[in-house]
Every structure is written in structure tokens, then in C-alpha cells.
């Protein structure tokens, strides 16, 4: 993941870190974030920089928390609440401040752009266990967000469209279950890829199943099929793709080297049934 190496120095990071110590004090967290945002006005570029630092801080903290931890839950809930309930930021004239056509912080302006910029995994080289776990954790975080945004029938919950990262689910599942993992440079790399797919099923399984049942598609070839299924004209979630993933994840368990990742895959395959 490409996240600023100085992220821990950001005031936004310190605010979120403090929130994890007192997750029930959401209003106090909002107040500190608003103060931070208002200090940038009227400089629009500085406000955008603030948002970039805030979203980077969310993603970095999520990547450092175990996917099953209470801290991940707290970050997901905070981002949900920030999206839908945080008071809007107003300028000196009392007008709502907007970025990219959205009121700050409603609809999380620039969060999607930030997530996309850092969403890459170095599968062309051997990775250490820390990098492996970071990738699995951030996939779990985004899967949790998607589960909050999309109901088990595949429809978006009103007001939560900014949290729908179901396309990222396709990318992670395709990388692990539709490509030839024998081409990856090391077992830790394939463990990371398979583990990332597993947490999508574990934390957003019913949502992804609902999207598959409703044939959710995306424009162009962003959700195309992987090499092992190159003859399929998949452009998103489908019933037969879901069946292929179920089969492939079960078989992928035999490729996993780390016991904790193997256990994770076992839990995910059970959740898919």
C-alpha cells in the first residue's frame, strides 16, 4: 500500500488514534476534526490536503489493526458516522464548504480517490509477514465498509453509497482465485493474496452473495475475469462467478503455508456455505 511515510505525524492521525482509546466519544472526535478543517479555510488546497491526510490516517490505522479487532470496528463505525451524521463545515459566511461537489464531511469527499491511490500490493516480489498482514487487514476494513453500504440483497443502503467498495472485492478475489498463484514469487505473497480474499468473504460474504445473485456489473473491463477464467465474459458479480470463487477458495487452502491464514480461509469457506 502506498501511504505517506509521515502519516503518524499528521494531526488527523493523532485525532483518530485518540478516538480508538475512547471510541464512545464520537462528538469530541468530530469537534477536533472540524477545528482541523476550519483552520485550513479559506484555502481550498489546504482543505483538500487535510482530507487526504485524514483518509490516509484511516487507511493506515486500519491496516495496522488486526482484522478481527475492536479497533477495526471502531474505525468502520466512525467513518460511517462521519459520512452520514457529522455536522457540515461552514465558512465565515455560514455557507457549507464543499469539495468535489460534496459537503465536508458528508459523502467522504476524496476518500475513494485516496483509497484507489494506495490500493496496490507488491505481488511481483516476496513480502514479509508484516506486509502480508497489512494487506489482509486493509482488505478486511474495506470489506466491512462495503457490508455497511450494501445489503445482503445487493442493494445499496440509503446514504451509504460512499462506502461501497464492492469493486475492490472483485479485484482481491480475482487476484487470489482467478489467477495462477504459482507465478507469485513466494509463499508469503500467495498467503497474502489468499488471506485478502478470505477476509472479503468473512466480513462481506452475504453482501457479495447478494451482488452475485443480482448480477452487479461495472463499466468497461475493470471487473473482468482472471487468467484461469479468461473465456468468461464476467464484468462484475454473477452466480457462476460466486460458485467459482467458492470452489477456488476451498482448493486454495491447500496452498497456504501460515497456520493463521489457513484458519482464516477455513472460516471464510464455512461462511460462504
Spans of features found by a protein language model:
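Eukaryotic acidic, Ser/Thr-rich intrinsically disordered low-complexity regions
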Residues: 241-273
Amino acid at each position: 500500500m502506498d501511504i505517506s511515510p509521515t502519516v503518524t505525524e499528521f494531526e488527523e492521525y493523532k485525532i483518530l488514534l485518540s478516538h480508538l482509546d475512547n471510541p464512545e466519544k464520537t462528538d469530541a472526535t468530530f469537534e477536533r476534526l472540524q477545528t482541523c478543517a476550519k483552520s485550513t479555510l479559506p484555502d481550498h488546497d489546504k482543505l483538500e490536503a487535510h482530507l487526504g491526510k485524514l483518509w490516509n490516517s484511516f487507511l493506515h490505522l486500519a491496516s495496522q489493526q488486526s482484522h478481527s479487532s475492536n479497533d477495526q470496528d471502531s474505525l468502520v463505525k466512525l467513518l460511517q458516522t462521519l459520512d452520514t451524521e457529522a455536522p457540515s463545515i461552514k465558512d465565515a459566511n455560514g455557507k457549507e464548504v464543499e469539495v468535489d461537489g460534496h459537503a465536508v464531511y458528508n459523502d467522504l469527499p476524496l476518500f475513494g480517490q485516496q483509497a484507489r491511490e494506495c490500493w496496490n500490493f507488491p505481488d511481483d516480489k516476496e513480502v514479509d509477514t508484516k506486509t502480508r498482514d497489512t494487506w489482509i487487514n486493509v482488505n478486511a476494513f474495506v470489506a466491512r465498509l462495503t457490508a455497511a453500504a450494501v445489503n445482503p440483497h445487493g442493494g445499496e443502503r440509503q446514504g451509504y453509497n460512499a462506502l461501497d467498495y464492492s469493486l475492490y472485492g472483485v479485484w482481491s478475489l480475482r487476484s487470489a482465485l482467478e489467477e495462477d498463484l504459482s507465478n507469485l514469487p513466494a509463499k508469503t505473497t500467495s498467503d497474502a493474496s489468499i488471506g485478502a480474499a478470505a477476509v472479503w468473504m468473512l466480513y462481506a460474504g452475504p453482501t457479495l452473495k447478494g451482488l452475485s445473485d443480482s448480477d452487479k456489473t461495472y463499466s468497461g473491463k475493470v471487473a473482468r475475469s482472471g487468467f484461469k477464467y479468461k473465456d468468461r465474459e464476467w464484468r462484475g458479480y454473477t452466480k457462476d462467478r460466486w460458485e467459482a470463487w467458492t470452489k477456488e477458495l476451498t482448493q486454495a487452502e491447500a496452498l497456504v503455508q501460515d497456520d493463521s491464514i489457513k484458519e482464516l480461509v477455513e472460516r471464510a469457506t464455512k461462511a460462504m456455505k
